[in-house]
A protein has these predicted regions:
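A short-motif feature that recognizes glycine-rich, charge-decorated loops
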Residues: 1-179
Length: 179
């Protein structure tokens, strides 16, 4: 009977020890977790990159190192700037998706890793009627899993991974291959 009691006591102590270890790991900084962290809002959803409403957007600017496309909201909907075309790009649909863009992963940049952000493959900017930036995002390469894409909010030190579908339409509008 003493051996059984000792076995249960040992099992209980091991369970408490593992629980304390998990708690300690969860409270450490992201650098201790391979350089990444998972970001969530109070409801448990991945944290939004920006807080704005698509109704406030008056301009969308897509820029690559070699070209740019500027769309303005007009009385008839979204119109590309003079001399530019946005065939197949639905700005209204994109803004509805982009305004909810979420990232549940942030990475501390590693100097030996390619992210496609220097320079970015694409910069997305959303402006309001007065020209103030509602959102800005640099878009880089596809992540190794093929499902996410490296992005960076200008001015933030960390790199984030967002689902690739969130950037597929603007990449296609700028004729950048988007799997």
């Amino acid at each position: 009977m003493n051996a059984a009691r000792a076995g249960w006591s040992l099992l209980l102590a091991a369970g408490i020890g593992l629980s304390l270890w998990q708690w300690r790991e969860a409270t450490e900084s992201p650098q201790r977790h391979g350089g990444h962290t998972h970001l969530h809002d109070d409801s448990g959803k991945p944290a939004r990159l920006h807080a704005w409403s698509p109704a406030d957007a008056a301009q969308v600017v897509l820029a690559t190192p070699g070209a740019s496309l500027r769309l303005r909201r007009g009385a008839q909907g979204w119109v590309a700037a003079a001399g530019q075309t946005a065939d197949g790009f639905d700005a209204e649909e994109f803004l509805a998706l982009f305004s909810q863009a979420r990232s549940d992963r942030a990475l501390v940049p590693q100097p030996d890793q390619p992210y496609g952000l220097t320079p970015p493959q694409l910069r997305i900017e959303v402006l309001d009627a007065s020209g103030a930036k509602l959102a800005s995002l640099d878009v880089g390469e596809l992540a190794p899993d093929g499902l996410g894409r490296y992005v960076q909010v200008p001015g933030e030190p960390e790199i984030r991974i967002v689902p690739n579908y969130q950037t597929r339409a603007p990449l296609a509008a700028m004729a950048i291959a988007a799997p």
